[in-house]
Curated annotation (Swiss-Prot):
Protein purpose: Catalyzes the NADPH-dependent reduction of L-glutamate 5-phosphate into L-glutamate 5-semialdehyde and phosphate. The product spontaneously undergoes cyclization to form 1-pyrroline-5-carboxylate.
Matches recorded under CDD domains: ALDH_F18-19_ProA-GPR (cd07079)
Catalysed reactions, semicolon-separated: L-glutamate 5-semialdehyde + phosphate + NADP(+) = L-glutamyl 5-phosphate + NADPH + H(+)
The protein's enzyme class: oxidoreductase
Assigned EC number: 1.2.1.41
Annotated GO biological process: L-proline biosynthetic process
UniProt-recorded name of the protein: Gamma-glutamyl phosphate reductase
Upper classification of the organism: Bacteria, Pseudomonadati, Pseudomonadota, Gammaproteobacteria, Pseudomonadales
Domain of life: Bacteria
Keyword Amino-acid biosynthesis included in the entry's annotation: yes
Organism: Pseudomonas aeruginosa (strain UCBPP-PA14)
Pfam family, one: Aldedh
Length: 421
């Protein structure tokens, strides 16, 4: 690359800004045509995708990437199938752009409503998973946003191969190539440039490790949609149905360990602990989950439960490790969650309607649940289609961010020669 990284990123930004204006007025049928053509291009380019991905995997093995990272990096035939299906699914989703709602007349006689519009240009910064390229590009395209995608250097060849398929889809639909751009330099200065261009980029969505997200949150000069941690809780109330409690607490921890909506701390009311914890501990031990507990939990379950420290209550393990605390009641459970949680997803298991309503009202998280596993905190499960990420922020988008989270609203006003007096 002969131009400087800053000049290169500025060029991408200018092109994306110009493309965003065209995308904002693109017809739904045209956007869907691009998505479906990109899906067909991916299907036809399976050999090319596999070859590019093998280059990344070989480099990753040579550089000592951990097996878990290599697994996330791999584009298996099944994952290519999922990417193709993902594009086709997004094409079937309702287009939010241009929708006008809440139309009403006001005393002056004018009619006022709100129109849903794209954000503009979305910068996506992510690590490892090449499939994020498809998730992000498809949602941004359908919602009328241009996007600049900066994937991890370990996936550069895979991302470029995927981008070529997306570009083919854009071309077939008559949409600008700059609607979806993949950063082709692995220079880390590109990240700093991308998050520092408010004249070109309207929002940044980081997906990756805590260090990356903290850096972007600290240094970005444009708004950021993010979540730092997934410290999710399940609280088993004294009025819980025991079968439901065991089923949910098992699933919330052991269905998968790595996702950000996996339970990391189990809270149990002292009045039900002797009935709920022993059978749960048996399940966890059979599945190889390491248990850490407070003094009451260790006294009940035995010495093989490790002592939970203050740090455990604040830790997202992403591993078969679970912290357990026995609490005196709902007040203590809510206090624990609001003190140690990450405002991601928390659940109560109870048959007491008043306790459920209090939990929903007082737990300060993006998703709060009653008698359901935290693993449901996902755009697909919420009926949003794909998601671009999960936000624990309180401004703009909160929770799983799908198409609507990539839009904003503007007021539209209709009059008939009205003037203000």
């Amino acid at each position: 690359m002969t131009e400087s990284v800053l000049d290169y990123m500025s060029r991408l930004g200018r092109d994306a800004r110009a493309a965003s204006r065209l995308l904002a007025r693109a017809a739904t049928a045209q956007k869907n045509r691009a998505l479906l053509a990109a899906a067909d291009a991916l299907d036809a380019a399976r050999a090319e995708l596999s070859h590019a991905n093998e280059q990344d995997l070989a480099a990753g093995r040579a550089n000592g990437l951990e097996p878990a990272m290599l697994d996330r990096l791999a584009l298996t035939p099944a994952r290519i199938d999922d990417m193709i299906e993902g594009l086709r699914q997004v094409a079937t989703l309702p287009d939010p752009i241009g929708e006008i709602r809440d139309m009403r007349y006001v005393p002056s006689g004018i009619q006022i409503g709100k129109m849903r519009v794209p954000l503009g240009v979305v910068g996506i910064i992510y690590e490892s998973r090449p499939n994020v390229t498809i998730d992000a590009a498809s949602l941004c395209l359908k919602s009328g946003n241009a996007t600049i995608l900066r994937g991890g250097s370990e996936a550069i060849h895979s991302n470029q191969a995927i981008a070529r398929c997306i570009q083919q889809g854009l071309a077939e639909a008559g949409l600008p190539a700059a609607a979806v751009q993949v950063v082709e330099t692995t220079d880390r200065a590109a990240v700093g440039a991308l998050i520092s261009m408010p004249e070109y980029v309207d929002v940044i969505v980081p997906r990756g490790g805590k260090g990356l997200i903290e850096r972007i949150s600290r240094e970005a000069k444009v708004p950021v949609i993010k979540h730092l941690d997934g410290i999710c809780h399940v609280y088993i109330d004294v009025a819980a149905d025991l079968d439901k409690a065991i089923r949910v607490a098992d699933n919330a921890k052991t269905q998968r360990y790595a996702p950000c909506n996996t339970m990391e701390t189990l809270l149990v009311h002292a009045g039900i602990a002797e009935r709920a914890l022993p059978p749960l501990a048996t399940i966890y031990r059979e599945k190889g989950v390491e248990l850490r507990g407070d003094a009451a939990t260790r006294a009940l379950l035995g010495a093989d439960v490790l002592e939970a420290t203050e740090e455990d209550w604040r830790t997202e393990y992403n591993a078969p490790i679970l912290s357990i605390r026995i609490v005196d009641g709902l007040d203590a459970a809510i206090e624990h969650i609001n003190t140690y949680g990450s405002q991601h997803t928390d659940a109560i298991i109870t048959e007491n309607f008043s306790d459920a309503r209090r939990f929903l009202a007082e737990v300060d998280s993006a998703s709060v649940m009653v008698n359901a596993s935290t693993r449901f905190a996902d755009g697909f499960e919420y009926g949003l289609g794909a998601e671009i990420g999960i936000s624990t922020d309180k401004l703009h988008a909160r929770g799983p961010v799908g198409l609507e989270g990539l839009t904003s609203e503007k007021y539209v006003v209709f009059g008939d020669g009205h003037v203000r007096t």
